[in-house]
Amino acid sequence: MALELDPRLPIIVGTGQIMIRDAATEPLEPAELMAEALRRAETDSGGTGLLTGADQVLTVRELSWRYRNPALAVAERIGATPRRLATSVVGGNLAGVMVARAAADIQAGAAEVIVITGGEATRTRSRLRKAGLEPEWSTQSDSVESPESIGDLRPLVNEMENARGVQLPVHVYPLFEVALRARLGLSVEGHIERIGSLWSAFSEVASTNPN
């Protein structure tokens, strides 16, 4: 019996990555790095027209250069005219949040194709700064509208946590681990084995990544 898939099932159809380590290579600004990663993702998908037909362009907030609307800068480079342009606030979890929300939008029928990207050129900025140079990267006029913002800027630590010195990841993550272990009903040894198996699989995949 063939398995029937939900026609609105969200699927990641392609991924792309670019990393420039060679100092002799012409440096790319963040928007172009993001666009090139998307081009590679489209190639990885085996399809065509995904980028130009994107309903949403979502970008992770970049730190190495400031665009008034990073999502628009990327959309222009990939030839997309999306209904939605959005950029995250700064935060290590926002890329995952955007993937989850994109999946929800596709499941709900609010979009067909959503592209998510991020890119930094911090090493290039640092190298130019040491040489006393400023990058000649693109800028956007003040008339460009800001993108929709994804995420919020709530303090990472609340008053109760501050009062108890629970401020750094090394303090917080163990609490998550204990709570997760309790929820799953695992012993300490069983939890360690489960986590070890999980990260071993991650490591196996990472070992095949040329970047």
Predicted regions and their residues:
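Conserved "HGTGT" condensation-loop signature of ketosynthase/thiolase-family condensing enzymes
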Residues: 1-87, 104-111, 115-211
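Active-site nucleophile and cofactor-binding loops and adjacent substrate-binding regions
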Residues: 85-95
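Conserved phosphate-binding catalytic cores of ATP/NTP-utilizing and phosphoryl-transfer enzymes
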Residues: 96-104
